[in-house]
Amino acid sequence: MVTGERAVTAAGGFNPSWQRHVAAYELCARFLGPGPVLDLGCGVGHSFERLAPRETVGVDIAAEALRGQARRTIVADMRAVPVGDASFDSVVCMHAVEHVPDPERVVAEARRVLRPGGVAVFVTPNRLTFGLPDEILDPYHFVELDPEQLRGLVAASFDGVEVLGLFGSERMNAFLAPEKRLMGRVLRLDPLALRRRLPRRVLQRLYDTTLTLARRRADPLAAAIGTHDFSLAADRVAEAIDLVAVGRVA
Protein backbone atom coordinates (compact mmCIF):
# COMPACT_ATOMS: atom_id res chain seq x y z
CA MET A 1 0.00 0.00 0.00
CA VAL A 2 1.38 3.38 -1.02
CA THR A 3 0.06 6.87 -0.32
CA GLY A 4 2.61 9.11 -1.93
CA GLU A 5 4.21 9.95 1.41
CA ARG A 6 7.32 8.34 -0.04
CA ALA A 7 7.07 8.34 -3.81
CA VAL A 8 8.48 4.97 -4.83
CA THR A 9 6.58 4.22 -8.03
CA ALA A 10 5.06 6.04 -10.97
CA ALA A 11 2.49 3.28 -11.49
CA GLY A 12 -1.23 3.94 -11.86
CA GLY A 13 -2.88 6.48 -9.61
CA PHE A 14 0.40 7.15 -7.87
CA ASN A 15 1.97 8.70 -10.98
CA PRO A 16 0.88 12.26 -10.04
CA SER A 17 2.67 12.01 -6.68
CA TRP A 18 5.78 10.71 -8.42
CA GLN A 19 5.71 13.51 -11.00
CA ARG A 20 5.11 16.12 -8.29
CA HIS A 21 8.26 15.02 -6.47
CA VAL A 22 10.35 14.85 -9.65
CA ALA A 23 9.10 18.27 -10.77
CA ALA A 24 10.18 19.80 -7.46
CA TYR A 25 13.77 18.75 -8.11
CA GLU A 26 13.74 19.86 -11.74
CA LEU A 27 12.19 23.25 -11.03
CA CYS A 28 14.37 24.01 -8.03
CA ALA A 29 17.65 23.07 -9.73
CA ARG A 30 17.82 26.64 -11.09
CA PHE A 31 18.61 27.94 -7.60
CA LEU A 32 21.57 25.62 -7.00
CA GLY A 33 25.23 26.15 -7.73
CA PRO A 34 27.33 23.67 -9.73
CA GLY A 35 29.01 22.20 -6.65
CA PRO A 36 28.05 19.28 -4.39
CA VAL A 37 24.48 19.02 -3.10
CA LEU A 38 23.25 17.40 0.12
CA ASP A 39 19.73 15.96 -0.30
CA LEU A 40 18.06 15.74 3.12
CA GLY A 41 15.27 13.15 3.32
CA CYS A 42 16.13 12.01 -0.19
CA GLY A 43 13.91 8.93 -0.32
CA VAL A 44 14.48 6.73 -3.35
CA GLY A 45 16.81 9.23 -4.98
CA HIS A 46 15.13 11.57 -7.47
CA SER A 47 18.00 14.03 -7.10
CA PHE A 48 20.60 11.61 -8.46
CA GLU A 49 19.34 12.10 -12.03
CA ARG A 50 17.39 15.36 -11.78
CA LEU A 51 20.27 17.41 -10.37
CA ALA A 52 23.00 15.89 -12.55
CA PRO A 53 25.78 16.57 -13.38
CA ARG A 54 26.15 17.93 -9.85
CA GLU A 55 27.50 15.53 -7.27
CA THR A 56 24.67 14.68 -4.87
CA VAL A 57 24.78 12.94 -1.49
CA GLY A 58 21.53 11.43 -0.27
CA VAL A 59 20.51 11.34 3.40
CA ASP A 60 17.56 9.35 4.69
CA ILE A 61 16.69 7.65 7.94
CA ALA A 62 15.25 4.65 6.06
CA ALA A 63 18.04 2.37 4.87
CA GLU A 64 15.73 0.53 2.46
CA ALA A 65 15.05 3.77 0.57
CA LEU A 66 18.78 4.21 -0.07
CA ARG A 67 19.47 0.66 -1.15
CA GLY A 68 20.79 0.42 -4.72
CA GLN A 69 21.39 4.13 -5.27
CA ALA A 70 24.54 4.61 -7.35
CA ARG A 71 25.94 7.48 -5.32
CA ARG A 72 27.13 8.23 -1.82
CA THR A 73 24.30 7.87 0.67
CA ILE A 74 24.10 8.29 4.44
CA VAL A 75 21.63 6.56 6.73
CA ALA A 76 20.96 9.30 9.26
CA ASP A 77 18.40 11.57 10.85
CA MET A 78 18.33 14.73 8.74
CA ARG A 79 18.38 16.76 11.95
CA ALA A 80 21.88 15.49 12.76
CA VAL A 81 23.86 14.54 9.66
CA PRO A 82 27.40 13.17 10.17
CA VAL A 83 29.14 15.56 7.77
CA GLY A 84 31.41 18.50 8.48
CA ASP A 85 30.49 22.15 8.73
CA ALA A 86 30.56 24.16 5.48
CA SER A 87 31.00 21.05 3.32
CA PHE A 88 28.34 21.58 0.60
CA ASP A 89 27.48 24.31 -1.88
CA SER A 90 23.75 23.51 -1.86
CA VAL A 91 21.16 21.63 0.18
CA VAL A 92 17.75 20.41 -0.95
CA CYS A 93 15.01 19.11 1.32
CA MET A 94 11.97 18.00 -0.64
CA HIS A 95 8.77 17.07 1.18
CA ALA A 96 10.62 16.22 4.37
CA VAL A 97 10.44 19.00 6.98
CA GLU A 98 6.78 18.19 7.63
CA HIS A 99 7.77 14.71 8.82
CA VAL A 100 9.54 15.83 12.00
CA PRO A 101 8.10 17.65 15.03
CA ASP A 102 10.99 20.12 15.12
CA PRO A 103 11.65 21.29 11.54
CA GLU A 104 13.78 24.16 12.82
CA ARG A 105 16.49 21.59 13.51
CA VAL A 106 16.43 20.46 9.87
CA VAL A 107 16.77 24.05 8.69
CA ALA A 108 19.59 24.74 11.14
CA GLU A 109 21.40 21.59 10.00
CA ALA A 110 21.10 22.68 6.37
CA ARG A 111 22.64 26.01 7.30
CA ARG A 112 25.47 24.34 9.21
CA VAL A 113 26.67 22.24 6.28
CA LEU A 114 26.56 25.08 3.73
CA ARG A 115 29.59 27.03 2.60
CA PRO A 116 29.53 30.84 2.36
CA GLY A 117 27.33 31.83 -0.56
CA GLY A 118 25.44 28.54 -0.34
CA VAL A 119 21.77 27.93 -1.04
CA ALA A 120 19.19 25.63 0.54
CA VAL A 121 15.81 24.81 -1.01
CA PHE A 122 12.95 23.48 1.12
CA VAL A 123 9.73 22.18 -0.45
CA THR A 124 6.71 21.30 1.70
CA PRO A 125 2.94 20.98 1.18
CA ASN A 126 0.94 24.17 1.54
CA ARG A 127 -1.21 23.96 4.68
CA LEU A 128 -3.71 26.38 3.16
CA THR A 129 -4.38 23.96 0.30
CA PHE A 130 -4.49 20.58 2.03
CA GLY A 131 -5.12 21.16 5.73
CA LEU A 132 -7.77 22.49 8.07
CA PRO A 133 -7.31 25.63 10.17
CA ASP A 134 -7.07 23.62 13.38
CA GLU A 135 -6.01 20.15 12.25
CA ILE A 136 -3.35 18.35 10.25
CA LEU A 137 -5.21 15.76 8.20
CA ASP A 138 -2.19 13.79 7.02
CA PRO A 139 -1.17 11.57 9.96
CA TYR A 140 2.35 11.25 8.54
CA HIS A 141 2.89 14.98 9.07
CA PHE A 142 3.91 16.50 12.38
CA VAL A 143 3.73 20.07 11.08
CA GLU A 144 2.18 21.84 8.11
CA LEU A 145 3.05 25.39 7.16
CA ASP A 146 1.56 28.35 5.37
CA PRO A 147 3.79 30.71 3.34
CA GLU A 148 4.60 33.09 6.18
CA GLN A 149 5.27 30.27 8.63
CA LEU A 150 7.72 28.72 6.17
CA ARG A 151 9.39 32.08 5.60
CA GLY A 152 9.84 32.56 9.35
CA LEU A 153 11.17 29.04 9.81
CA VAL A 154 13.90 29.48 7.19
CA ALA A 155 14.68 33.11 8.08
CA ALA A 156 15.65 32.02 11.60
CA SER A 157 18.78 30.33 10.18
CA PHE A 158 19.44 32.00 6.82
CA ASP A 159 20.52 35.48 5.76
CA GLY A 160 17.97 35.80 2.97
CA VAL A 161 14.75 33.95 2.14
CA GLU A 162 12.49 33.84 -0.91
CA VAL A 163 9.17 31.94 -0.82
CA LEU A 164 7.51 30.76 -4.02
CA GLY A 165 4.64 28.46 -4.90
CA LEU A 166 4.71 25.21 -6.84
CA PHE A 167 1.47 25.12 -8.82
CA GLY A 168 -0.32 22.32 -10.62
CA SER A 169 -1.90 22.61 -14.04
CA GLU A 170 -5.65 22.42 -14.58
CA ARG A 171 -5.16 18.73 -15.26
CA MET A 172 -3.36 18.17 -11.95
CA ASN A 173 -5.97 20.14 -10.04
CA ALA A 174 -8.70 18.09 -11.70
CA PHE A 175 -6.97 14.93 -10.52
CA LEU A 176 -6.75 16.20 -6.93
CA ALA A 177 -10.36 17.36 -6.73
CA PRO A 178 -11.96 13.89 -6.23
CA GLU A 179 -9.44 13.06 -3.48
CA LYS A 180 -10.34 16.26 -1.66
CA ARG A 181 -14.05 15.47 -1.99
CA LEU A 182 -13.48 11.94 -0.69
CA MET A 183 -11.56 13.26 2.30
CA GLY A 184 -14.39 15.69 2.98
CA ARG A 185 -16.93 12.87 2.98
CA VAL A 186 -14.78 10.86 5.37
CA LEU A 187 -14.49 13.81 7.75
CA ARG A 188 -18.26 14.32 7.72
CA LEU A 189 -18.63 10.78 9.04
CA ASP A 190 -16.82 11.92 12.18
CA PRO A 191 -18.58 15.15 13.23
CA LEU A 192 -17.30 14.86 16.81
CA ALA A 193 -13.68 14.59 15.59
CA LEU A 194 -13.15 11.36 17.53
CA ARG A 195 -10.32 10.59 15.10
CA ARG A 196 -8.16 13.01 17.05
CA ARG A 197 -8.14 10.55 19.95
CA LEU A 198 -6.83 7.66 17.86
CA PRO A 199 -3.17 6.60 17.92
CA ARG A 200 -1.11 7.97 15.03
CA ARG A 201 -0.44 4.46 13.70
CA VAL A 202 -4.18 3.74 13.43
CA LEU A 203 -4.77 7.04 11.65
CA GLN A 204 -1.99 6.23 9.21
CA ARG A 205 -3.63 2.91 8.30
CA LEU A 206 -6.98 4.62 7.75
CA TYR A 207 -5.35 7.33 5.66
CA ASP A 208 -3.45 4.78 3.57
CA THR A 209 -6.64 2.82 2.91
CA THR A 210 -8.64 5.88 1.91
CA LEU A 211 -6.08 7.22 -0.55
CA THR A 212 -5.21 3.80 -1.95
CA LEU A 213 -8.87 3.20 -2.77
CA ALA A 214 -9.10 6.63 -4.37
CA ARG A 215 -6.00 6.12 -6.49
CA ARG A 216 -6.93 2.66 -7.70
CA ARG A 217 -9.80 4.08 -9.70
CA ALA A 218 -9.41 3.96 -13.46
CA ASP A 219 -8.51 7.60 -14.04
CA PRO A 220 -6.84 8.45 -17.36
CA LEU A 221 -5.77 11.77 -15.85
CA ALA A 222 -3.30 9.99 -13.59
CA ALA A 223 -1.29 8.51 -16.45
CA ALA A 224 -1.32 11.76 -18.41
CA ILE A 225 0.26 13.92 -15.70
CA GLY A 226 3.95 14.70 -16.12
CA THR A 227 6.50 17.14 -14.79
CA HIS A 228 5.23 19.65 -17.35
CA ASP A 229 2.06 19.93 -15.25
CA PHE A 230 3.91 21.86 -12.53
CA SER A 231 5.39 25.34 -12.41
CA LEU A 232 6.94 27.83 -9.99
CA ALA A 233 5.60 31.34 -9.39
CA ALA A 234 6.04 34.12 -6.86
CA ASP A 235 2.44 35.36 -7.13
CA ARG A 236 -0.61 33.99 -5.27
CA VAL A 237 1.61 31.67 -3.28
CA ALA A 238 -1.19 31.00 -0.78
CA GLU A 239 -3.01 29.07 -3.55
CA ALA A 240 -0.07 26.80 -4.44
CA ILE A 241 0.02 23.04 -3.99
CA ASP A 242 3.48 23.17 -2.43
CA LEU A 243 5.60 25.91 -0.93
CA VAL A 244 9.23 26.49 -1.91
CA ALA A 245 11.60 28.40 0.36
CA VAL A 246 15.02 29.37 -0.96
CA GLY A 247 17.42 30.21 1.86
CA ARG A 248 20.71 31.94 1.09
CA VAL A 249 23.92 32.21 3.09
CA ALA A 250 25.85 35.48 2.87
Feature-to-residue mapping (PLM):
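Conserved N-terminal segment of class I S-adenosyl-L-methionine
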Residues: 1-84, 90-94, 107, 165-167, ...
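Short conserved AdoMet
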Residues: 32-33, 52, 101, 115, ...
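A short His-aromatic
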Residues: 95-99
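Short N-terminal helix/helix-N-cap motif within the alpha/beta-hydrolase-1
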Residues: 101-105, 132
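A short glycine-rich, Lys/Arg-flanked "PGG" loop and its adjoining helix->strand segment in the class I
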Residues: 104-116
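Short, glycine-/aromatic-enriched active-site segment of Class I SAM-dependent methyltransferases
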Residues: 122-143, 147-148, 152
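A C-terminal cap/extension of S-adenosyl-L-methionine-dependent methyltransferases
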Residues: 165-250
